[in-house]
Regions:
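Helix-loop-helix junctions that connect adjacent transmembrane helices in secondary transporters/permeases
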Residues: 145-236, 401-478, 680-701
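Thiamine diphosphate
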Residues: 230, 251-274, 278-279, 492-500
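Flexible, low-hydrophobicity surface segments
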Residues: 1-160, 186, 272, 600
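Glycine-rich loop/linker segments at domain edges
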Residues: 6, 12-15, 82-83, 87, ...
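C-terminal catalytic domains of large/alpha subunits in multi-subunit enzymes
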Residues: 67-68, 237-242, 272-277, 306, ...
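Short acidic, glycine/serine/threonine-rich loops at helix termini
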Residues: 74-79, 118-121, 229-231, 254-260, ...
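Conserved catalytic cysteine-centered active-site region
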Residues: 95-96, 239-242, 246-247, 271-282, ...
Length: 758
C-alpha cells in the first residue's frame, strides 16, 4: 500500500506547535459577554431563596439567572446516540444542589471583574441536607438523591431511582456456582479503583452567538458536536433546526468532553440576550465540577484446575456515579464485557453490577470507559491465581486466553475474526527478555519485579453509532474530504486522508480534510468509543468507491466510450486503446468549466454490525525500594494488535500516551473528598500526574491481524492502550515485595503497611 501504513505527519502539526489561533477561546470575539457560575458550597441542599438584586445592579452585569428563570425540562449531558441510556435527571439550574460545585446561578457581564463581583453579591439561603458520600452504602439508604417526579429513562437500564440505583443488571453464561464447587482452586478477592481526572490541557469552554438568520451558533471544545446540538435543543426547549454547533481544534479530551458540561450555560445566555457570550472553566472547575472516571469496587471469584485451566469467573461491580447519571449505565457494561472475554474458554461466567448515586461530582467518560477498571480486577486475580498455583503468569495466559475465530459469549456473542493476542504476548516477552529474567530480582537497596497484563477494547458501538463523510473532486485535481468526526489530537484528519489517498491512488497532500460544523459536516456520532478509524474509516472507503465510479462514468461520457473502456490510475484518465488521455487536473477543470458540467461528489455512511476488539499486552518491570517502599517503573513494554496500522507514528504515540495515563492511575492519581463532600484534589499540585521523570522507558510494538470488516483491515487503538499498566504494575510489586495491593493508587505507604501485615 502506498499511503496506508506510512508514518505521515499530522496535517495540523505546524499550526498546533506554532501556536496558531485554532482553539475555542482563540476564536471568541473579544467583546463577548463573560459567563460564570455560582456553585454550591454544600454537597446536598435545597435552595430556600436567592437574592440577586445587588448583583444585578453592579455596572457591566447583563443578567443573573437562577432556577426560576430557566426551562424546566429534564435532560442528560451525556454525548450518546438517541435514545440515550443515561437518565434524564437534570435541569439547567434547579432548586436542589447535589454536590459541592453544582450550579446555582448564571452570571453574564461585560468583563471578568464585574462578573466576579456579582457572584460574591448573590445571597443564597440553603436548607443543608445530610449528604450521601459512601457509595457502598448508597443502595436503599434513607437519603435519596433524586426525588423529583419528572425523572425519566428512555431505555431499560435496571434503574430504581428511589433506591439510588442508576443502573443494574447481569450477564450469565453457564452455572457459575456449580462450576466453582468442582474447581481445585478457588480465589475470592476485592479490588478498588478510584475516580481519576482526565486532566486534559484545555479546560471546558464554549462560546455562542446569534447569526444573521437568528440561529444559535455554539462553538465548543467538544468530542460530540451533533450530540451537543440535541442536548441544547432538549435543555433550551428549542428545535434543533435553530442550532448549529461548530467544533474547533480541541486541546485534549480523553472522554471528558463526551459530556456537554458547559455549553448549556452560554447557549442559554445568548439565546435569552441575543448577544455573544463565552464561558471558560478554571482548572479548579474542570477538576471539581465537570466529570471523572467512575470509582468502582469489584468482587471477583475465580476457579481453576490444579494445572491452571480456568473454569469459572464471577465478577460483581459497584460503580459510583456521583450526583447525575451521565454514562453510568454504559461504562459499567464494559467493566465485564471487556474483561471476561479475554478468557473465553471458561465453562461459566457471570457479570453482575450496580451503579449508584452519591453526592459527589458526576462521573463520566474517560479513556477505557469502564474496561480499565474491570480489567484491573480480572487481570489482577489472574496474576494472583498464577502465584497461587506456582505458575508463570504468561504460561497461565497462554493456557486460557481467547483465540481467533472464537465466539465471545460475554462479548455480545460476537465472532472474533482477527486476534493476534497470543503473538502479542510472545513478542512482549521477547522485547523484555522475559524468559531470562526471574519474576523477582534482588538488586541491593531495591527489588525488581515483573508483571504481566492483557487487554481488549472495542471498535465503535456496533449497530448504533454512525460515521459519515463527503468527498469532492475539486478543480485542479485535488480532493476535499468533509467529516463530522472530531480530531482531538488523535490525528483522524490525517488518518482518514491517508485512506482517501490509498483509495484514489493520490498523494496525501492532495487531500484536504475539512472538519466542519453540524450544518455542513455529514453526520457523525462523535469521537468516542474508539470509533473513528474503524467506523468513519469505512465510510471513507465506501465514499471513495462511489467517487471513483463517478469519475469513470463522467470520463466515459466525455470520451463517448463505455465505462469499462476507461482506466484511472489516480493521476490520469485514458481509454484502454489510449486514443484519449487526460490528466486528472485537466479532467477536473473540464468538469468545473462546462466541458462535462458535472460536479463529482460522493458521500456515504457506515454503521458496523460488529465491534471487533483490539488487543494489547503489557509487561512492567518495577523497582521497589526496600526501606522506603518507593516505586519506580524501570521498563514497560507493550505490543498492540489493532489490525492494520494506518499510521505507525500516530498509533505509537497513542499507545505511549495511554500507557503513561495508566501508570498515573496505578501509582499516583486519586480523587478524594472531605467528610463534607468537597473535592481535595482540584489542581495539578494536589492531583499527582506522572511527570517526565516518573515515566520509564516505554516501548511499543505492533502485531498485525486483519479485520475483514475494517478499513484496510484496521481496528481501533485509542482506548485499549490505557488498560494494562494497573494490573501489570500491581503484579510486579507483588513479585518484588510479596504484597498484593488491591486498591489503587499503589503507594509506598500501602506497600510498606502491606509488608508489615504480611
Amino acid at each position: 500500500m502506498n499511503s496506508v501504513g506510512k508514518g505521515v505527519i499530522k496535517k495540523d502539526a505546524m499550526a498546533l506547535v506554532t501556536g496558531q489561533p485554532v482553539y475555542c477561546d482563540d476564536l471568541a470575539p473579544k467583546d463577548c459577554l463573560i459567563v460564570k457560575l455560582l456553585r454550591s458550597p454544600h454537597a446536598y441542599a435545597k435552595i430556600k431563596s436567592i437574592d440577586t438584586s445587588i448583583a444585578k445592579r453592579i455596572p457591566g452585569i447583563e443578567a443573573v439567572y437562577t432556577y426560576e428563570d430557566v426551562p424546566t425540562s429534564r435532560f442528560t449531558l451525556a454525548g450518546q446516540s438517541y435514545p440515550e441510556p443515561s437518565p434524564y435527571d437534570r435541569r439547567i439550574l434547579e432548586n436542589v444542589v447535589r454536590y459541592v460545585g453544582d450550579e446555582v446561578a448564571i452570571v453574564a457581564g461585560a468583563n471578568e471583574d464585574c462578573v466576579d463581583r456579582a457572584l460574591k453579591a448573590i445571597k443564597v439561603d440553603y436548607e443543608v441536607l445530610e449528604p450521601l458520600l459512601d457509595f457502598e452504602n448508597s443502595i436503599d439508604n434513607a437519603i435519596v438523591i433524586h426525588e423529583e417526579d419528572d425523572y425519566k429513562c428512555l431505555c431499560e437500564i435496571g434503574n430504581d431511582v428511589k433506591r439510588n440505583i442508576v443502573s443494574s443488571g447481569e450477564s450469565v453464561v453457564g452455572d457459575v456456582d456449580a462450576v466453582l464447587k468442582e474447581c481445585d482452586v478457588v480465589l475470592e478477592r476485592d479490588y478498588h479503583t478510584k475516580a481519576n481526572a482526565q486532566a486534559m490541557m484545555e479546560t471546558m469552554r464554549s462560546y455562542c452567538y446569534i447569526d444573521t438568520y437568528g440561529r444559535l451558533n455554539c462553538v465548543s471544545s467538544t468530542q460530540i458536536p451533533f450530540h451537543v446540538r440535541r442536548i441544547l435543543s432538549n435543555a433550551l426547549e428549542i428545535p434543533k433546526s435553530k442550532i448549529n454547533v461548530i467544533k474547533p481544534r480541541i486541546g485534549g479530551g480523553f472522554g471528558a468532553k463526551q459530556t456537554a458540561c458547559c455549553e448549556i450555560f452560554t447557549a442559554f445566555v445568548t439565546w435569552k440576550l441575543k448577544k455573544p457570550s463565552k464561558i471558560v472553566y478554571t482548572r479548579e472547575e474542570t477538576f471539581a465540577a465537570s466529570n471523572s472516571r467512575h470509582e468502582m469496587k469489584m468482587h471477583v471469584r475465580i476457579g481453576a484446575t490444579k494445572d491452571g485451566k480456568i473454569e469459572a469467573i464471577d465478577l460483581y461491580t459497584l460503580s459510583n456515579q456521583g450526583a447525575y447519571g451521565e454514562h453510568g449505565p454504559t461504562t459499567i457494561g464494559l467493566a465485564g464485557h471487556k474483561s471476561l472475554p479475554l478468557y473465553n474458554h471458561v465453562k461459566a461466567s457471570r457479570f453482575t453490577y450496580d451503579v449508584v448515586y452519591t453526592n459527589t461530582m458526576r462521573a463520566g467518560a474517560y479513556r477505557g470507559y469502564g474496561a480499565t477498571q474491570g480489567q484491573f480486577a480480572v487481570e489482577s486475580i489472574i496474576n494472583e491465581l498464577a502465584d497461587e498455583l506456582n505458575m508463570d503468569p504468561c504460561e497461565i495466559r497462554f493456557k486460557n486466553m481467547t483465540r481467533e475465530n472464537e465466539v465471545l459469549s460475554q462479548y455480545y456473542n460476537e465472532e472474533l475474526n482477527a486476534c493476534a493476542l497470543d503473538r502479542c504476548l510472545e513478542k512482549a516477552m521477547e522485547m523484555i527478555d522475559y524468559k531470562n529474567k526471574p519474576l523477582r530480582r534482588d538488586m541491593g537497596d531495591f527489588v525488581r519485579g515483573l508483571g504481566v497484563s492483557l487487554s481488549m477494547q472495542g471498535s465503535g458501538i456496533s449497530g448504533l453509532d454512525v460515521g459519515s463523510v463527503e468527498i469532492k473532486l475539486q478543480d485542479d485535481g485535488f480532493y476535499t474530504l468533509s467529516i463530522g468526526a472530531t480530531d482531538m489530537g488523535t490525528g483522524c484528519d490525517t488518518i482518514l486522508a491517508q485512506m482517501v489517498a490509498e483509495c484514489m491512488d493520490c498523494d496525501v497532500d492532495q487531500v484536504v480534510t475539512s472538519s466542519l460544523d453540524t450544518d455542513h459536516a455529514p453526520y457523525d456520532t462523535g469521537s468516542y468509543a474508539s470509533s473513528t478509524t474503524y467506523v468513519t474509516g469505512m465510510a471513507v472507503v465506501k465514499a471513495c468507491e462511489k467517487l471513483r465510479n463517478s469519475i469513470l462514468e463522467a470520463a466515459a461520457g466525455f470520451f463517448n466510450v463505455d465505462k469499462e473502456d476507461i482506466e484511472f490510475d489516480g493521476k490520469k484518465i485514458n481509454t484502454l486503446d489510449h486514443a484519449h488521455e487526460m490528466s486528472l487536473a485537466d479532467f477536473a477543470d473540464t468538469c468545473f468549466n462546462g466541458g462535462i458540467a458535472k460536479a463529482l461528489i460522493a458521500s456515504d455512511s457506515h454503521m458496523s454490525p460488529t465491534s471487533p476488539p483490539p488487543f494489547m499486552v503489557g509487561i512492567a518491570e518495577v523497582d521497589v525500594d526496600k526501606l522506603t517502599g518507593e516505586i519506580k517503573v524501570h521498563d514497560y513494554v507493550s505490543v498492540v494488535d489493532c489490525g492494520t496500522v494506518i499510521n505507525p507514528n500516530l498509533a505509537r504515540v497513542q499507545a505511549e500516551g495511554g500507557i503513561v495515563q495508566g501508570i498515573g492511575m496505578a501509582l499516583s492519581e486519586d480523587i478524594t473528598y472531605s467528610n463534607e463532600g468537597k473535592m481535595r484534589n482540584r489542581n495539578f499540585l494536589q492531583y499527582k500526574l506522572p511527570t517526565r521523570v516518573d515515566v520509564p522507558s516505554v516501548r511499543v510494538e505492533f502485531e498485525s491481524s486483519y479485520e475483514d470488516n475494517g478499513p484496510f483491515g484496521a481496528k481501533s487503538i485509542g482506548e485499549v492502550v490505557i488498560n494494562t499498566p494497573t494490573s501489570a504494575i500491581a503484579s510486579a510489586i507483588k513479585h518484588a515485595m510479596g504484597v498484593q495491593v488491591r486498591t489503587l493508587p499503589i503507594t509506598a505507604e500501602k506497600v510498606l503497611l502491606g509488608k508489615e501485615n504480611e
